[in-house]
């Protein structure tokens, strides 16, 4: 019996939201000889389909011996789409068939399009594909034919492996199941995502996709997302969701040339009405540094009632709606997001390292093995991009849209198909540096067993020495920092070992843009070193206020510009380097704030009417938290209040009010 054959055939998937990168990679199974006849020779499997009548009667002259007759049928998974209105609820579409995807589109989107005159479709532009949450599938109408086309051998003799039987030997059976999983991943990518994109384009629409899945995602996250027009990650205000999804999206966007990397942002469950911009910001900034540059706030629920507060809500999502008590001031928050999104969409992302995710499927994240030292950035990359988009220029793995990587890290595994390994070998020969170990065999049954000799030959040749053609070869086991040093790749950003500061870097022909984020609640002061040439000079672009100012205190040395940086708790800033800076110079990078006046006069507070607060203004001698009030109408008040007081002060160019 094949170990864990339900998982290997995708008849059962890990029911967890974040399967590890190696969840569908299995160690070689301990095996026994065939003395008891448990292994089925592939030439003993007979196809009886032609002997089956339309009424289900099997007519067959059975040869001598003991035979097992198996009947394999295709049926729906039984999964229905959700959430959906009753009228729009039905079985999930076959995601490995463009024909069925087109039919699904016509029955749903087509009906909407037919009801809206073309002249009135000004706001209907995008078809959204949310995260994959519908379970797997492992078959489609023409599965046998497409299998033969993809791999060059007939899969029918190996079908008993779908219910755990060993055909040929354990290795051959496992390889067949590997081919099956890979074919499913390809089908879901090209027929579902690509098919929906194609039919949308025919109707003047584009697609927007979250390229990861929970509860049965059968695809490969990079290839899957690469077929969509636009790509998105996701993060919640708390918990682990977002820790892999946003890197999934940004890597996909970078290697497939998508300018905008969206994120379903600030989704949440749990305690109601506890989210507000200040406690969302650090998490937003964190995922900005992972490549997100287009924020889609989750969510705004339509509010049909004027007299009901806090209005209609749901168990999921932050309440970005007009019934929220801070909605009237939300422009401060959205302006910060808009400014950040704009700058993070400029130029090209800077990354030194590309981690190859391997070819095994299903897969919705890659492996960062070994860990990348602090101060460097990376992307995940897949086989499709090697085969169709990648070339080497000046020692960099270069993609058509401008992305460049100096070092390719191979996954810690022994298998790779010869066409992929051969392409990597060509790239290294042309000047790329690679880190890893020589693959020894193919994971596929296609071309078996001769294909293993080809993989071993290419791998041995590539990893025989520390140079291959124009490229460099580094064996797994060498400390990665030593590899980067040998290639003269210095950290892109340095700020001290223990600083809680994250960064991302984007480059333009005439500017370098760094986004830096303090992830702690306390103020930090550090000397930032940026890998920027000396013809540039630094500016601070404040995404909260829109202020742009020159930073006069900096030094240029050995490929870096260093300058003192100060960030308040959870503050973020853009450090932009430009040539020929013409901004007005200031004396200090971060002028110190000086207390010029203390307000000791009483405060008159008027609470918003209709929110169950005090009906008349109250007077406090000093400011305090409403939650500490003994007056319940203040303690539990949810709304806005106007504070008024009088005080004397001298005239200054700029004053800040600190009410903490």
Identify the residue ranges that each predicted region occupies.
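Mature N-terminal, pre-catalytic/accessory segment of carbohydrate-active enzymes
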Residues: 1-124
């Amino acid at each position: 019996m094949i170990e864990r054959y339900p998982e290997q055939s995708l008849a059962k998937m890990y029911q967890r939201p974040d399967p590890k990168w190696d969840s569908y990679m299995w160690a070689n199974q301990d095996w026994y000889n065939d003395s008891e006849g448990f292994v089925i020779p592939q030439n003993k499997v007979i196809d009886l389909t032609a002997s089956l009548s339309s009424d289900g009667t099997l007519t067959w002259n059975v040869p001598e011996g003991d035979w097992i007759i198996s009947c394999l049928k295709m049926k729906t998974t039984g999964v229905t789409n959700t959430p959906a209105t009753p009228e729009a609820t039905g079985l999930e579409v076959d995601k490995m068939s463009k024909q069925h995807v087109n039919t699904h589109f016509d029955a749903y989107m087509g009906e909407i399009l037919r009801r809206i005159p073309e002249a009135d479709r000004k706001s209907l532009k995008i078809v959204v594909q949310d995260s994959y949450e519908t379970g797997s599938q492992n078959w489609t109408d023409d599965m046998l034919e497409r299998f033969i086309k993809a791999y060059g051998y007939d899969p029918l003799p190996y079908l008993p492996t779908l219910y755990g039987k060993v055909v040929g030997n354990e290795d051959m059976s496992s390889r067949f199941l590997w081919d099956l999983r890979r074919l499913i991943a390809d089908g879901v990518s090209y027929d579902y995502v690509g098919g929906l994109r194609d039919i949308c384009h025919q109707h003047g629409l584009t697609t927007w996709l979250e390229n990861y899945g929970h509860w049965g995602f059968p695809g490969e996250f990079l290839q899957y997302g690469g077929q969509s027009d636009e790509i998105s990650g996701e993060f919640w205000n708390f918990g682990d969701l977002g820790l892999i999804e946003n890197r999934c999206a940004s890597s996909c966007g970078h290697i497939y040339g998508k300018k905008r990397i969206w994120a379903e942002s600030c989704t949440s469950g749990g305690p109601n009405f506890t989210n507000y911009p200040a406690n969302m910001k650090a998490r937003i900034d964190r995922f900005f540094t992972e490549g997100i540059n287009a924020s889609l706030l989750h969510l705004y629920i339509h509010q049909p009632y004027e007299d009901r507060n806090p209005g209609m809500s749901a168990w999921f999502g932050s309440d970005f709606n007009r019934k929220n008590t801070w909605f009237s001031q939300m422009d401060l928050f959205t302006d910060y997001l808009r400014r950040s999104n704009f700058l993070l969409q400029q130029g090209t992302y800077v990354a030194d390292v590309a981690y190859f995710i391997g070819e095994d499927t299903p897969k919705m994240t890659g492996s960062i093995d070994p860990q990348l030292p602090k101060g460097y950035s990376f992307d995940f990359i897949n086989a499709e991009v090697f085969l169709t988009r990648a070339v080497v220029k000046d020692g960099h793995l270069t993609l058509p849209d401008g992305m460049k990587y100096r070092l390719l890290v191979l996954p810690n595994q022994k298998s790779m198909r010869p066409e992929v390994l051969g392409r990597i070998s060509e790239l290294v020969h042309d000047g790329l540096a690679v880190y890893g170990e020589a693959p020894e065999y193919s994971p596929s049954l296609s071309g078996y067993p001769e294909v293993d000799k080809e993989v071993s030959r290419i791998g041995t040749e590539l990893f025989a020495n520390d140079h291959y053609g124009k490229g460099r070869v580094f064996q797994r086991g060498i400390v990665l920092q030593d590899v980067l040093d040998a290639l003269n790749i210095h950290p892109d950003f340095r700020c001290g070992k223990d600083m809680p500061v994250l960064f991302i870097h984007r480059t333009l022909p005439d500017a370098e843009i760094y986004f830096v984020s303090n992830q702690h609640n306390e103020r930090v002061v550090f000397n930032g070193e940026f890998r920027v040439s000396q013809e540039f000079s630094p500016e601070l672009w404040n995404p909260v206020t829109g202020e742009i100012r020159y930073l006069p205190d900096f030094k240029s040395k050995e490929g870096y510009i260093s300058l003192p940086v100060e960030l308040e708790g959870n503050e973020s800033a853009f450090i932009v380097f430009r040539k020929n800076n013409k901004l007005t110079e200031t004396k200090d990078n971060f002028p110190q704030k000086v207390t010029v006046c203390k307000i000791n006069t009483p405060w008159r507070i008027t609470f918003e009417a209709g929110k169950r607060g005090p009906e008349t203004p109250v007077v406090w001698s000093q400011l305090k938290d409403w939650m500490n009030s003994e007056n319940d109408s203040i303690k539990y008040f949810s709304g806005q209040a106007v504070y008024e007081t009088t005080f004397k002060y001298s005239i200054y160019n700029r004053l800040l009010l600190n009410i903490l």
